[in-house]
A protein has these predicted regions:
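Glycine-rich tight-turn/loop motif centered on a GG-T
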Residues: 20-32, 95-98, 112-122, 196-206, ...
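Alpha-helix-loop-beta-strand connector modules within alpha/beta enzyme cores
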Residues: 42-48, 62-63, 98-103, 125, ...
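C-terminal accessory subdomain/extension
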Residues: 287-381
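Active-site-proximal beta-alpha core segment in soluble small-molecule metabolic enzymes
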Residues: 56-195
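Conserved, mostly hydrophobic/aromatic
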Residues: 35, 58, 88, 148, ...
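Active-site loop/helix belt of alpha/beta enzymes
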Residues: 145, 151-266
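A charged N-terminal "starter" segment
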Residues: 1-113, 377-381
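Active-site loop ensemble at the mouth of alpha/beta enzyme cores that anchors a bound cofactor
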Residues: 201-203, 236-314
Length: 381
C-alpha cells in the first residue's frame, strides 16, 4: 500500500504555490473563488426554508470538499457506492446516505460494518433486500437507516408510489428491533435535472411532489412515521425546496457545474452557480492553421453529455476526442494556437469527469493553493 501511495503522489500534477502555468497537464483544476461562491450560494438558497441540505458527493468524490460543504451547513452527504461511503467515513464524515440499492452478501456486510462507525442510510425497493439488510446488521450488531425509494418519473430504481411503497415501509418497520430504522422516502427525479425549459422542470417535479406527498400520507395513515422525504438535484432543487413535501435536498453538481448544466434555461429568481471546474490542457500539436491537438481526451473528460467547451476562447470548438487527444477547430480569422499553449476546457458532465482524475488542483489568482485527492474515485464496489 505504501508503494501505491508513493506512486500516486508521484503523479500529482502540481504542488502548492506553483503557478497555474506550471501545473502539469492534463489536470482537473478548480477556480477556488468561484467554488467558494457556489458553496455560499447554495447555503443561502436553502437557509430558512425548513429543509436540510445533504449534498451528493458523487459529483466530487473528495472528502476535503465534503468537509467544506458540512462547514457551510450541510448535515451530511450522499454517495452511490459502499466504497465511496467507506472513503468518506475514513476521512471523518460521520453522516452518509447511500442513495442506491446495495445487493450482494459482501457489500451488505461492509455496509453493516461501516454503520458501526458512522450514521449510515441506504435505499431499498425490494422486500428480499430488506431481509438481507436485516441479517447483515444483526451479524454486525449495527443499525442502518433505510429509506424506501419510489419511482417519481425517472424510471430507474424505485417501487411504484402508493401501496407498493407502503408494503415495503412495513417490511422495514418490522425489523425495528433488529437494527433497521425506517427513515422515510427517497424521491429523486434525475431525468428532470437537464430538462432545458423551466416549465418542463416544473411539470416534472410537480408530478414527483404529488407522488411523494400521497405516498407519505398513506404510510403515515398506516401508523408508520415518515420523517424524511429526500431527493432533488442542482437543476431542480428550488422546486423541491418550495414544495412543502421534501425535507432534504441532494444537489451535487452545484459546486462545479458543467457544460450541460450551462444549457439549462433559468428563471430570473433561480440561484446562479458559476463554472468552477476545468480540464487544464496543453496544445501538443498544431499541424494546420485550422486545427490544434490538446493532451486531454477521453481519459481526461467524459463525453456522455457532449464534448467539452473551450473556456477562454469560445470561438474554438472541440470537434472530437480519442483516448489521449482532443481536437480543436480553429476558425478562419481566429488567433492560431501554438504548441505549448494552455487551454481550459469545460467538461460536458462533471461527475464522471472527476472520476477520471486522482487529484483536484485548487487555484486562486493564478497560483495553486491546494491539491486534494479524489479519494472515492473508482469506488465501484
Amino acid at each position: 500500500m505504501r508503494s501505491e501511495n508513493t506512486a500516486l503522489a508521484a503523479r500529482m500534477p502540481a504542488q502548492v504555490d506553483d503557478l497555474l502555468a506550471e501545473v502539469d497537464t492534463p489536470a482537473l483544476v478548480i477556480d477556488l473563488d468561484r467554488f467558494e461562491r457556489n458553496l455560499v450560494a447554495m447555503t443561502e438558497a436553502v437557509r430558512g426554508n425548513g429543509v436540510r441540505l445533504r449534498p451528493h458527493a458523487k459529483s466530487h468524490k473528495c472528502p476535503e470538499i465534503a468537509k467544506r460543504q458540512i462547514a457551510h451547513g450541510a448535515i451530511g452527504i450522499c454517495c452511490q457506492k459502499v466504497g465511496e461511503a467507506e472513503a468518506f467515513v475514513a476521512a471523518g464524515i460521520s453522516d452518509v446516505l447511500v442513495t442506491n440499492e446495495i445487493v450482494g452478501a459482501h457489500k451488505l456486510a461492509r455496509l453493516a460494518a461501516l454503520a458501526r462507525s458512522a450514521a449510515i442510510g441506504v435505499l431499498v425497493d425490494d422486500p428480499g433486500n430488506v431481509a438481507e439488510l436485516a441479517a447483515a446488521v444483526a451479524h454486525a450488531r449495527s443499525t442502518l437507516e433505510v429509506l424506501v425509494e419510489i419511482d417519481v418519473g425517472a424510471h430507474r430504481c424505485g417501487v411504484a408510489p402508493g401501496r407498493s411503497a407502503l408494503e415495503l415501509a412495513r417490511a422495514v418497520a418490522s425489523h425495528a428491533g433488529a437494527g433497521l430504522r425506517f427513515g422515510g422516502l427517497h424521491a429523486y427525479q434525475g431525468a428532470a435535472q437537464h430538462l432545458r425549459r423551466p416549465s418542463e422542470r416544473r411539470a416534472a417535479i410537480a408530478r414527483a411532489v404529488e407522488c411523494a406527498r400521497d405516498t407519505r400520507v398513506l404510510i403515515e395513515s398506516a401508523g408508520i412515521a415518515c420523517p424524511t422525504v429526500t431527493g432533488a438535484g442542482t437543476g431542480t432543487f428550488v422546486l423541491e425546496r418550495d414544495s412543502g413535501v421534501y425535507t432534504e435536498l441532494q444537489p451535487g453538481s452545484y459546486v462545479f457545474m458543467d457544460a450541460d448544466y450551462g444549457r439549462n434555461e433559468l428563471n430570473s429568481s433561480d440561484p446562479v452557480f458559476a463554472q468552477s471546474l476545468y480540464v487544464w490542457t496543453t496544445v501538443m500539436s498544431a499541424p494546420a492553421g485550422d486545427r490544434a491537438i490538446v493532451d486531454a481526451g477521453l481519459k481526461a473528460f467524459s463525453v456522455d453529455s457532449g464534448l467539452p467547451l473551450v473556456a477562454d476562447r469560445p470561438e474554438l470548438e472541440c470537434t472530437k476526442a480519442s483516448d489521449e487527444h482532443g481536437v480543436l477547430r480553429v476558425p478562419s480569422g481566429a488567433k492560431n494556437l501554438r504548441v505549448g499553449d494552455k487551454i481550459r476546457l469545460v467538461p460536458g458532465h462533471c461527475d464522471p469527469t472527476v472520476n477520471l482524475h486522482d487529484w483536484l488542483v485548487g487555484v486562486r489568482k493564478g497560483r495553486v493553493e491546494c491539491v486534494w485527492p479524489v479519494s472515492a474515485r473508482g469506488a465501484l464496489l
